[in-house]
Amino acid sequence: VYKRQPQELLKTYGTERQPAAQNLIDFDKEWSSLMADPNATQEVADYYVEAEAFAAGMMTEYSQNLVVSDTAHQDLATGFPVGRRFKSAIATRRCDARKLHLGHEHQADGRWRIYAFADTDKTKLNEWAKSFNLPVDFADIKVIYQQPCHDIEVLDAPELFRPKVGTLNIPMWENVWTGEDIFAERGISRDGAVVVVRPDQYVAGVFPLDESVENFFKRLRDPQTVE
């Protein structure tokens, strides 16, 4: 955080975790009360099924703050609720045609994940990619096209998704993906969308393919906000 992010970011830990901790305490109280009742066998079973996702940590939902946007554009990707944990889905990595879970490609490297889901004719995506950029050490930016794997070539993707890395400046080809199924599975608009995922794998925001993505990150990276 030091000199890279505004100090206000530190406050979000408390504002996010306190309500989550209270929800967990309330859950434990209700669960332990049911378990202590010898006549509540069916109630215990029903409650366990209902609360399974919560107990697994998948129902935590953070409210809007510095690192969680509003939900004005949630309809562009209904399967990735803002403020909740990123729910992975399978897509095809174009460079080797392997079907993989997007979420399994996350590395514990402290970077943000940005998923640009292309519009049908790729016009909006290409325009957006011309002006948007973040350092490779800050964000991992991937594109997912609607078309089948062999209808897309890696070199057709904007340079934003083919950054040169390492001492030899070798182009990274692993950021170009396809996956017509993921659009239907996760309720992603055919007009395109950008899903921003925090380093802790919680969805920070859903945006259209426009300057709203840049505006979200500007408040995190503007030197005037960093002491």
Model regions and ranges:
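Helical substrate-recognition/capping region of FAD-dependent monooxygenase/halogenase enzymes
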Residues: 3-227
